[in-house]
From Swiss-Prot:
Subunit structure as annotated in this protein's UniProt entry: Monomer.
Binding site for Fe cation: C19, C22, C52, C55
Species whose genome carries this gene: Chlorobaculum tepidum (strain ATCC 49652 / DSM 12025 / NBRC 103806 / TLS)
UniProt entry tagged with the keyword Metal-binding: yes
PANTHER family in the record: RUBREDOXIN, RUBREDOXIN-1-RELATED
Protein name: Rubredoxin-1
Keyword Transport recorded: yes
UniProt GO MF annotations: electron transfer activity; iron ion binding
Family designation: Belongs to the rubredoxin family.
Alphabetized CDD domains for the sequence: rubredoxin (cd00730)
Keyword annotations from UniProtKB, A to Z: Electron transport, Iron, Metal-binding, Transport
């Protein structure tokens, strides 16, 4: 039997964005209903004046990371 190692399924990988100031995580799949950001909104499509809903740090202070579910 020949078993090939496979990379994690794309559905298992998710790009999220973390605030450098407070650690808040913006998950595009969840959006942020408190700030009227609908689920499915990619980070790069957020308004330029969007800021962290926890500490008000600007959007350009978020860093991208990929987590494996």
């Amino acid at each position: 039997m020949n078993v090939k190692e496979s990379e994690p399924a794309q559905a298992d990988l998710q790009a999220s964005w973390m605030c450098a100031e407070c650690g808040y995580i913006y998950d595009p799949a969840e959006g942020n209903l408190e700030t009227n950001i609908r689920p499915g909104m990619p980070f790069d499509k957020l308004p330029d004046d969007w800021s962290c809903p926890v500490c008000n740090h600007p959007k350009n202070q978020f860093t991208k990371f990929i987590s494996q579910l």
